[in-house]
Amino acid sequence: MWKSIGELSCDDYVKAGLTLEDAKEFDKLVSDVITKAIETDPRDQWKALVDESVLKPWHPHPLHQLLYYSVYSNWDSSVHGPPLYWFPSLSQSKSTNLGKLMEYHGPRLLGPSYKNPLESFELFRRFSVEHPEVYWSFVIDELSLVFHTPPRCILNKSKPEGTWLPDAVLNIAECCLMPSSHPKKEDDSVAVVWRNEGFDDSPVNRMTIKELREQVMLVANAISGSFEKGDTIAIDMPMTVDAVIIYLAIILAGCIVVSIADSFAAKEIATRLKISKAKGIFTQDYILRGGRRFPLYSRVVEAAPSKVIVLPASGTELHVQLREQDVSWMDFLSNAKPHSSGENYYRPIYLPVESVINILFSSGTTGEPKAIPWTQLSPIRSACDGWAHLDVQVGHTYCWPTNLGWVMGPTLMFSCFLTGATLALYSGSPLGRGFGKFVQDAGVTVLGTVPSLVKTWKRTNCMEGLNWTKIKFFATTGEASNVDDVLWLSSKADYKPVIECCGGTELASSYIIGSPLQPQAFGAFSTPSMTTRIIIFDENGVPYPDDQPCTGEVGLFPQHLGATDRLLNANHDEVYFKGMPMYKETRLRRHGDIVKRTVGGYYNVQGRADDTMNLGGIKTSSIEIERVCDQADECISETAAVTLTPPNGGPELLVIFAVLKEGFKQQSGEELKMKFSRTIQKDLNPLFKVSFVKIVPEFPRTASSKLLRRVLRDQIKQELLSLRSRI
């Protein structure tokens, strides 16, 4: 139990890590600030402490905890909503991308109801939901889009999901590479900054738009010499500057990128190559991470691709022996067709806006990953989300440690190149100080994370002494945030906001998110994204009123720019629409999350409506986990996999229930935990980790023998709570 802020004394500050002398000064400073606000709302007290910079990034974390939790010690979230920690000022709001747009168009669109970006945000957001074609006509003009053939209109409403930018023809990669007057992108503008692990004291590398364009066109020429227009070409490598060049070059050449994460086992790579019918794959000989070298080419070859183009992880020479049909990066580039001018020029292949440019994968509940096609609309949606909700703009440097195999890789790239921001890449492990120093040295202004990454930084204290004060916004996605972890993160940049993002590969966007025009609460989403209408409904499909606190499954209105209208290996209608409730004569689109709407209109994601799991930000299924665990040892009769959210929030924990066969050597829970972990990491993903194993005599089932994972989840939750209370 925390004391109230008025009860804190010098002794409390000493216990939190200050020297006695510093504690006396700090006590006086806190008293001076709080005295002025002692009778006010705790939100005003916290705002005053932050505005006066009472807490510094270099203060020990227990001190930050002490003040935050003491200010809100008597706060009742069920009455007042979640405690807030960041409050945008009016001047800040008017300088944001969305704030400027609102100031310019708001009075005309909303009439006398329009006040300013802070007071009128929700009104304007609802306008964007009701009139998406008006909103998108404004925001699309803010991106560096170049249409070879302009769209006939913004939205044709003849179908339930609409047809967006009908008849438009373009090449979205070209839009990333060409100068523009608005946003202001010039040939000498910095497009990419990067640093390789192990060179932490070296200057940050820089590449201008012109240099990036020339490199992409060189590779596009080489691709045209080896592949045909429309071919699917995979990328399985870390998100280096070379990977970005290859990605854009594939699209510039009229081919389709197949995104494969560099963490996948050979079997998973093979599955994705087969589904996408990939004609070739770009990869590296090794992955360099944390001072170690991990084989990658050998893993890719085990997946039996038809052709591999192999880049060296460092230097110019490969450190592997290639198969006869495979080719080194340097030899591949030497086959590029030179342009008549002698320069690295390539004429882009222009395609309709609905053409597929990228195949990404998301695990479903059947064990086979869903092949999700991104069209040229998808990057537009992704970039617009970054523009509106993370305020990504010219002059900003945007970094998010990720991979082109996950949706955040392309999202990050297009959010930079279509808004005029600079893309920041660190080639190496983001877990240590080297990454943090790169964030400092590159002048990163928008830093994306996942909760498990933040937890590691906080636990190891590896970022101590670094200057992250240039950061304007943090972002986090993939899994639920732990409040104390994001308190730590925000404090490292003078309490800048951590924008929570929740969406999906199939949406090319978030559906709930934070906003620079709203106060933010740790671990909570403050709004549906611009133009997005969400409905929360109960177990009978009955929708809750929009302004009512509630918990239920979320459904999306189908008219969502950038969302998929097809899957390559599954029935799109069955996956996203079948069985969903109707709302105002419209069939809602399934996303599958259970969402809680709080008092005050904030949101928390409570888990999945089905048995899909979220492990370290990677969606997988109970069935897929169980399939490999069933083969982990001959004593296994059957297994059931569930996830559990820790009591204090944070990433989901993987729990395996096991029924053992009779007549075999009995195994302990710890022995099985090691075997399950090894099997899962070998056959599914090396990033997955088993937290608990529970041996049971049988599983609870329905009358039709359907496994009741929910009952198992509740059972282990109660056991852990009971154990915790005894401790």
From Swiss-Prot:
Keywords for the protein's UniProt record, in alphabetical order: Fatty acid metabolism, Ligase, Lipid metabolism, Peroxisome
Any single biological process term in GO: auxin metabolic process
Any GO molecular function: ligase activity
Keyword Manganese among UniProt keywords: no
Cellular component, GO annotation: peroxisome
Key word Lipid metabolism present: yes
Main location: other
Superkingdom of this protein's organism: Eukaryota
Expression tissues: Expressed in flowers.
Motif (Microbody targeting signal): 725-727
EC number: 6.2.1.-
EC class of the enzyme, as a word: ligase
Disruption phenotype: No visible phenotype under normal growth conditions, but plants are resistant to 2,4-DB.
Location within or outside the cell: Peroxisome
Biological role: May be involved in the peroxisomal activation of 2,4-dichlorophenoxybutyric acid (2,4-DB), a precursor of active auxins that inhibit root growth.
The family this protein is said to belong to: Belongs to the ATP-dependent AMP-binding enzyme family.
Protein name, as recorded: Probable acyl-activating enzyme 18, peroxisomal
Gene coding for it: AAE18
